[in-house]
Regions:
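Short acidic/polar alpha-helix capping motifs at helix-coil junctions
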Residues: 6-9, 120, 137-141
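Extreme N-terminal, non-catalytic leader segments
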Residues: 1-25, 198-207
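Short secondary-structure boundary segments
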Residues: 64, 94, 137, 169-170, ...
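Conserved P-loop
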Residues: 22-126, 206-307
Length: 325
């Protein structure tokens, strides 16, 4: 995962003074890799959590292009978890047909559905009703020529102050990227065919790694937690989640509110543990307590993995912990 926002150094920074707290940004999740819609839902959860913590309403519109109701999508279960957990804060609209098509296969129906979705988006942007508007798969709609790019860019650039816009999908137009405050690119990284065992597709779990210099890795993981909880809801059985954080012993991180919102809505499905000091850990300046905390969290992780209690375990900031030895 890469992005165009400027990083502030090595280590973990308490986020209370971070620009990620600011509102009204335009986020773009782009690229060939998976997880773009999942990351957007993580941002939605964070926004709802911040609204709860600050005792203000943070209403969200999830507007999905090119995702008709004829087939299920990976993020459907996460959206169900959001709607059940925060029923008065989420509006959800789907447009388009579900099958894949190319630019030379665009029909009048496709254009009409794209225009219907964009008209809903414009109304939502102008309404002052929403804190966040998610325009899922808007990028490929623009790439297919189904909407006028200049009109979309002008409307988004002139959005009301305080309104956060999240756009997902491959092939983001350069003119849209230029007006964004955060552009994250998801890139697939091959590690061999881990999805198959003895010629059969493996369906019972796996390992997903979110890495890179860009922001949004923890947010993407929260989207995965939502997806896991939603699967448990739809299958009418427990799908317990453990969120275990390294290098985050303090308070004020951007995902804190999202995790708290999850725990309040699904107290029997989400466990959360954190480790480390409330400080940046620099290479060559590690303190004994850093090693103790890292080992403590890893022992908890191993026990959780072996326990059979959890269907999803998020090991947040494990990568830099290992990198710092």
């Amino acid at each position: 995962m890469t992005n165009t926002s400027r990083n502030r150094g090595i280590g973990i920074v308490t986020a209370s003074d971070s620009q990620e707290r600011s509102k009204g940004q335009l986020h773009i999740y782009d690229g060939e890799g998976k997880g773009k819609s999942q990351a957007a839902l993580g941002v939605v959860l964070r926004t709802i959590g911040l609204g709860i913590c600050e005792k203000r309403q943070s209403r969200v519109l999830l507007l999905r292009f090119l995702k008709g109701p004829e087939r299920p999508y990976d993020e459907d279960s996460a959206i169900e978890a959001l709607q059940r957990g925060f029923p008065h804060l989420i509006d959800h609209v789907r447009t388009g047909r579900s099958e894949f098509f190319t630019a030379d296969q665009v029909t009048r129906f496709d254009i009409g559905e794209a225009e219907r979705g964009w008209n809903i988006a414009k109304g939502a942007i102008a309404s002052s009703l929403y804190s966040v508007v998610v325009l899922d798969e808007l990028n490929p709609v623009l790439d297919l020529g189904m909407l006028d790019i200049k009109e979309v860019v002008d409307s988004l650039q002139n959005r009301p102050d305080g309104l956060e816009i999240i756009i997902t999908g491959r092939a983001a137009p350069p003119s849209l990227v230029r007006i964004s405050q955060l552009h994250s690119e998801m890139r697939p990284r091959s590690t061999g065919d881990l999805s198959k065992t003895n010629g059969q597709r493996r369906c019972n779990g796996g390992i997903e790694i979110y890495t890179g210099e860009g922001k949004g890795k923890s947010t993407s993981a929260l989207g995965k937690a939502l997806q896991a909880i939603g699967k448990g809801i739809s299958q009418d059985k427990s799908h317990r989640v453990l969120i275990l954080q390294w290098l985050k012993g303090g308070n004020g991180y951007t995902e804190d509110a999202a995790i708290e919102a999850l725990r309040e809505s699904y107290p029997h499905l989400v466990d959360h543990l954190r480790s480390g000091r409330d400080a940046i850990v620099w290479r060559g300046q590690q303190q004994p307590i850093d090693y103790v905390e890292a080992e403590r969290a890893w022992e908890i992780a191993k026990a959780a993995i072996l326990s059979g209690l959890y269907k999803t375990i998020i090991l947040d900031e494990l990568n830099p912990t290992v990198d710092l030895e």
